[in-house]
Amino acid sequence: EAAAPSDDVKISIFYNEGADAIDTAKEMTQLAGYYITNDMCKEDMDNVMLQIERLPSKTPVMVEMKGPFGSFFYNSKLSGAVISQSTDIPAMEKLVARMNTKGFYKIARISSLRDRSFGEANVTSGLYMLSRAGLWMDTGGMYWLDPTSASTITWISSVVLELKEMGFDEVLLDDFRFPDSDAYIFSGDKPAALQTAATKIMEACSSNKFVVSFGVSDPTFALPDGRCRMYLSNVDAGSVAATYAKVTVSDPEIRVVFLSESGDTRYDKYSVIRSLNVAEEVENRKAE
């Protein structure tokens, strides 16, 4: 099990150009950054742009580039890609361009196995209802893909490689899990299926300067070899230490990242990507 990181572990600090900022050309290191959702961009892109201007070079910044409906929030060139009609694509392009010129450690976040559009167009790649009448749909109206399907692996890998070519340093495959339901057909070993899929995606996409990461629900998930991380969501500050203790991967202070909407200080000793909405709170506390 993983021991909590010591207090003297170097962590990248926002608004800090010093030695603890991330050098994207070197080894993976502990993360302390912000995430930007598509909803944030649609609601107030001016505020998003203002907030990122305050961040120093090499800050880890994550931006959502593809959602669970399957829509892309950028002009993907992939065959079959559905471009979001409710997203200001030129504004997103401007955001990504500014992330480049600011020299951020850039993370693209995509919904991976939860993908309504790809499921509709490629039914045999999805998880079927028990009746086999069609694909199983979750309460949000989304389809889920079968990680043992070759076309699922090819599709996800293609998206990752496109974002890699766009200059992202890391891609997070969100919802890299099975849905929590017994109303669909899957008779295999679910943890093994996910680990095999992760290995295949790593083989297709990884390099010595690029990180592929997996948004999982199980802290005991076994990461494949190579430059990769696991991200854990919906872990409240009171549970973060107990959750971290369940992790079995090597170098957990670097390879296990918590996604949090909160500025709570109990996340500080771990790798954490927080909502951009708490930047002011976190930075004011640091300045005290």
Q: What name fits each language-model region?
A:
Residues 5-18, 69-111, 181-209:
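Aromatic-lined substrate-binding rim segments of carbohydrate-active enzymes
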Residues 35, 105-115, 172-173, 191-234, ...:
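Aromatic-lined carbohydrate-recognition surfaces of secreted/lumenal glycan-active proteins
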Residues 137-222:
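Polysaccharide-binding and catalytic clefts of secreted carbohydrate-active enzymes
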Residues 60-65, 87-136:
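Glycine-rich, aromatic-flanked loop segments that form ligand/cofactor-binding clefts
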